Amino acid sequence: MSPDPHEDLGDVLTEPTQKTERPRMFKVLLHNDDYTTMEFVVGVLQRVFNKSVPEATRIMLNVHNRGVGVAGVYTAEVAETKIETVHSMAQADGFPLKCSMEPE
């Protein structure tokens, strides 16, 4: 007699385990220019990057003094969306503020 396929043999079937890799992260950079106001940059950092006023001010001063500053670190898709949002806001207000991303 063949074994009943419905009989519980105590074996547990498991799915092969797959390691989930962390997504590659990217720094979103703000670039200094001679026209975009400091107040506008602080506002962008607050609205787009959810920074507090002190943190936004610190980042803005880095951008102003060093020419570039890190607004945040995100996955590629999130970074691209934030860059597009910054560029849209800057264009709407007549500022040439530039934003870019680079691998962390």
Swiss-Prot record:
Binds to the N-terminal domain of the chaperone ClpA. This is ATP-dependent Clp protease adapter protein ClpS. Pfam families: ClpS. It comes from Desulfatibacillum aliphaticivorans. It comes from the Bacteria. Belongs to the ClpS family. The gene is clpS. Involved in the modulation of the specificity of the ClpAP-mediated ATP-dependent protein degradation. GO terms for biological process: protein catabolic process; proteolysis. Residues 1-20 are annotated as: Disordered.
